[in-house]
Design a protein with these regions (language model features):
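A Trp-anchored, charged/polar loop motif used as the substrate-binding/catalytic surface
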Residues: 1-10, 56-68, 105-117, 156-159
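Short, contiguous, well-structured surface segments enriched in hydrophobic/aromatic residues
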Residues: 70-89, 93
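A short acidic (Asp/Glu
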Residues: 30-32, 91-93, 131, 137-142, ...
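Active-site and ligand/interface coordination hotspots across diverse enzymes
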Residues: 1-54, 114-117, 162-171, 203-210
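Short, solvent-exposed loop/turn segments at secondary-structure junctions
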Residues: 23-28, 85-89, 132-136, 183-187
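Proline-aspartate-enriched helix->loop->beta-strand connector
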Residues: 113-132
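Surface-exposed cleft-lining segments at the edges of enzyme active sites
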Residues: 35-53, 85-109
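C-terminal capping/extension of enzyme domains
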Residues: 99-112, 116, 139-210
Length: 210
C-alpha cells in the first residue's frame, strides 16, 4: 500500500483490529509517508489545512467531536490507515479520477495482494473503505468465500452504506467484514452528511475498540 500504513499507537493492541482504507494521496508531496500525513492531521495547528479535510470528514463519520484534539487522537490511536492505489494522484481536478480508474484496472491484482498481505499479517477483522471505486475492486466473487453483508443503504440515488463479508475460503483466509462508503469528496454533491454515516460506523467501531 502507498508509502506504508499509518499505525495508531494502540492499533495493534485492539481485540478486533480495524483498517481504514483510502483510495490515494491527493495534493501532497509524494515523498511524505502515510504515517506522516495522519500525524500532520492530528497536529492542532493543521486542522483546517485543505489537503487534510479527507481525514476530518472521516473522523466526523466516526462520530468524533473534531473540535477536541483528544477525541481525534482516541479514534486514530486505535486504527490502521492505508491507501489502496500505489501512487500519489493530483488534486480533485478530474485527472485524478481518470488516473485512479486506469491504475485500478491495470493493477487490481497487485493492489489486492498488497491488501491481503497486510490484513493477514495484522489479523485485521474490520475494514472501513472510504471509496466505492476501491470497494468494487476488492475480491468480490460471490460463492468464493465472500458474500454481501446487507442490502445497500441509499442516500438519494447514491449508495451511502454497503458491505461485504469474507471467510476462510476467501483470499484473506480469515473472517473479515468490509464496510464501504463513497469517497468524502463526493459527499456534498450526493447530499451525504457525516452524521448519517456515524449512525452505522460508530457502533461497529465501539464494538471493535470500545
Amino acid at each position: 500500500m502507498y508509502h506504508g500504513v499509518y499505525e495508531g499507537a494502540a492499533a495493534d493492541a485492539q481485540e478486533k483490529k480495524i483498517l481504514i482504507l483510502g483510495e490515494s494521496h491527493h495534493d501532497l508531496d509524494s515523498s511524505i509517508t502515510t504515517q506522516e500525513v495522519v500525524e500532520d492531521y492530528l497536529s492542532p495547528e493543521n486542522t483546517t489545512k485543505q489537503s487534510l479535510q479527507f481525514f476530518h470528514k472521516i473522523a466526523l463519520a466516526f462520530g468524533v467531536d473534531t473540535g477536541k484534539v483528544e477525541e481525534k487522537a482516541r479514534l486514530w490511536d486505535k486504527v490502521f490507515f492505508g491507501n489502496y492505489i500505489n501512487k500519489s494522484l493530483d488534486g480533485p481536478s478530474g485527472e485524478g479520477d481518470e488516473t485512479a480508474q486506469t491504475l485500478i484496472a491495470t493493477n487490481r491484482d497487485r493492489y489486492n495482494q498488497d491488501l491481503v498481505d497486510f490484513i493477514k499479517a495484522h489479523a485485521i477483522e474490520t475494514v472501513f473503505c472510504f471509496s466505492d471505486r476501491v470497494f468494487d475492486a476488492l475480491p468480490n466473487e460471490e460463492g468464493h468465500g465472500s458474500w454481501t453483508l446487507f442490502q445497500d443503504v441509499k442516500c438519494g440515488k447514491a449508495d451511502l452504506w454497503f458491505g461485504r463479508g469474507y471467510g476462510p475460503d476467501s483470499p484473506f483466509c480469515r473472517e473479515l467484514k468490509v464496510y464501504g462508503v463513497p469517497h468524502p469528496r463526493y459527499w456534498n454533491r450526493a447530499g451525504i452528511k457525516p452524521e448519517e454515516l456515524a449512525q452505522y460506523i460508530r457502533p461497529i467501531f465501539e464494538d471493535c475498540c470500545g
